[in-house]
Amino acid sequence: MSSLQSTELFQQQAYINGQWLAAQSNATVPVSNPATGEEIGTITNMGAAEATQAVEAAYTALQSWKALTAQNRADILLAWHKLVLDHTDELALIMTIEQGKPLAEAKGEVRYAASFIQWFAEEGKRIYGDVIPTVNNQQRFIISKEPVGVVAAITPWNFPIAMITRKAAPALAAGCTVVIKPANETPYCALAIAKLAEKAGIPAGVINVVTGKSQEIGSVFTSHEKVKKLTFTGSTPVGRLLMQQCSSTIKKLALELGGNAPLIVFDDADLDKAVQGAIFAKFRNAGQTCVCANRIYVHDNIYQAFAEKFVQEVQKFKVGNGLEDGVQIGPLINEKAVLKAQQLIDDAVSKGAKIACGGKQHALGQTFYEPSVLTNVDRTMEIVQEEIFGPVAPLIRFTDEADVVVQANDTIFGLAAYVYSENISRLWRVSEQLEYGMVGMNATAISNEVVPFGGVKQSGVGREGSKYGLEEFMTIKYMCLGL
């Protein structure tokens, strides 16, 4: 990390109540570079005691933070936004070293992350109440919106900066305070963002970052009475557990969980646009996103032509360390992810699938996997039923519109789906039938700060981004005035 221009962004201690602290036990855990396996540094290994300390600090800070005007909070958030953009290169470098994604993608994520801070800083000034016409001339009915309170946020490793700002920015804009538990694979991004928040003048206790023992810290988040909302991005099994644990204190919940996104290409689609859209939807971040095209359904009439063009594009990818020029596919997060990709491919091949390209660990070894395409895939294979989270694209043949909609919906997940067709009636008809929280019609780059991100079914509850994402951090109060 010596190449960082601003070494103060590389923090190895947690951030609680405006102070950089070690665990009470002084214990640490190592953090490794997934591309090389080398140790980057360590983080302090905190547990329940420190998590409780952070929650109490957030609760104390809440009273003064929510008392500020929306404009006051916006000014501070916009200062944070500027600092994030000013430090794009340093933040991206930290991200690539600890997460693995190519440097160009990391820089894109920093800008994406900053957009949420700016959006919610401005949107926080447009939190409106209501006046309800009376049913009784002796009374008046007034509705106000108030911050929910202390928010606990558990964030993932695949987008280690954007998933923090997408949660923290609306919380702060609404007048809440936040305690963040980042993934142990990517803690330095979270700590760097906290350092910039400190420099921007966000008061002590308003943002806190606790690193270390996930289960202990998570248990405090779910059981502490002063935590009024839990927001989590991660796997569906962990989301179910957190929801269950929160039941004892009846918290507000936002869960952004797993996906199994279908991408449907009809025979009237623009083939080149569909291929490029599928490439982006499948291979961004080496396939490690919850909205990745997990199942690519292609109409029988164009299946062969699509497969040929798609494979040609996949074979052009440069795989390597994300710090190297021109690299488009970095490592997977760990060797377990490589093993999962291989197991899914082996299962599919054993049931009749064909490997069009890739299909094995990359010659670079370790956590690198070849961008892969499978043909002759069908619904009996595990790769159709599970979230892949790797650079493997299964191509599935279909002939009937109604049947492909049934296949696309045949999953417990409901996060994102994509449809390609030049028939506008078909686009609307199919999109309305798809049981997903988000549908891209002739588009796969669908996420930004102004639209609501989230799913249905076991892909979660709640929305992030947009005006709806701000409402997630507020409660409604009804006041009745007697005359």
Predicted regions, residues:
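ALDH superfamily catalytic-core signature
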Residues: 237-378, 441
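Short, well-ordered beta-strand elements within core beta-sheets of diverse protein domains
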Residues: 39-46, 61-67, 153, 263-266, ...
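Hydrophobic face of amphipathic alpha-helices that form TPR/SEL1-like repeat modules
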Residues: 1-35
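Glycine-rich loop-to-alpha-helix module at the N-terminal edge of alpha/beta enzyme cores
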Residues: 38-127, 138
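Structural signal for hydrophobic packing residues in well-ordered secondary-structure cores
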Residues: 62, 66, 81-88, 92, ...
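Rossmann-like NAD(P) dinucleotide-binding subdomain of oxidoreductase/dehydrogenase enzymes
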Residues: 129-273, 398
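Conserved C-terminal structural/oligomerization subdomain of aldehyde/semialdehyde dehydrogenase
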Residues: 36-42, 227, 264, 318-319, ...
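Residue-level signal for inorganic ion chemistry
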Residues: 37, 73, 95, 117, ...
